[in-house]
Amino acid sequence: STLNILRAFSKGGFADLNKVHLWNLDYIKKSPQAKKFKELEDKIADALAFMEACGITSDFNNRLYTVNFWTSHEALHLPFEESMTRVDSTTGEYHDTSAHFVWIGDRTRQLDGGHVEFCKGIENPIGIKCGPTSKPDEIAKICEVLNPKNEKGKITLISRFGHQNVEKFLPKLIRGIKKEGLNVIWSCDPM
């Protein structure tokens, strides 16, 4: 239900840049950033006034009053993820509707485990957390299982080594994935 209300707000005009002054942002007004935010509001209003003078308004361009948003989370609790999985009636493909993007955690990415098995069956983009215990050949095999067609954009490797380990582990992982010719997106979790 939270996602549905966000969808309604994002498409129903709440995100309209023309209403930036009306958004309930009391927390900003009480913060040290209030002056900067007010300046930003004013710049947006000036830009919109200029665009309107040029004939570009939200009457003709929905990008001025709607936004797209994407959600993600760790696919940790499999009974929940399974209950949120639906079949696309036009393609027959399965999608986890609990989020647009789900990831497998560092402690649950066993090749023969339930989390990999679940994610193997859905069409969502999938992230794989990679920490100091990750072995490049293991991560490569998981990528191949989750993305057998090696589609671009399907797999994101989320490095989570910590500042003290990143130089030791990340280059090996990058070389291992590159050697296998796998299409992945690289992301960093600074935790």
Regions found by a protein language model. Give the residues of each.
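Catalytic-face loop-and-helix region of soluble metabolic enzyme cores
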Residues: 143-191
